Amino acid sequence: MSSTQKLTAAGLRYQLFIRNKSLKWMASKLDWDVSKLSRRLKGTPAFNVIEIDRITEILGISFEELLTIPVDMHEKFFGTGTPDLEVTA
């Protein structure tokens, strides 16, 4: 899975976490079953642009906000395999 895919999946998990929402809730909003959402979160296959657009619309956030995870939450949502991402100011 690419760094962007990892960041997107982690961002979605983080957004659900801070909203106290479940994968089941998000899957129902997307008209998917939970197993399809789980596969997408694992990158098999990765989310496509239309799916990401729907997710950000459901959550009421921008794509940039989806990709924003506070540093102190990185380990929780990335584990030890934090993607090698360039940080810009």
Q: Where are the regions that the model predicts?
A:
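Short alpha-helical DNA-recognition segment
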Residues: 20-39
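Key DNA-contacting residues within the recognition helix of helix-turn-helix
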Residues: 13, 38-39, 67
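Short, charged recognition helix plus adjacent turn
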Residues: 2, 67-89
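DNA major-groove recognition helix of helix-turn-helix/homeodomain DNA-binding modules
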Residues: 50-65
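The alpha-helix within a helix-turn-helix
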Residues: 16, 27, 56
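DNA major-groove recognition helix of helix-turn-helix
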Residues: 41, 51, 70
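A short, Lys/Arg-rich alpha-helix, primarily the initiator
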Residues: 1-22
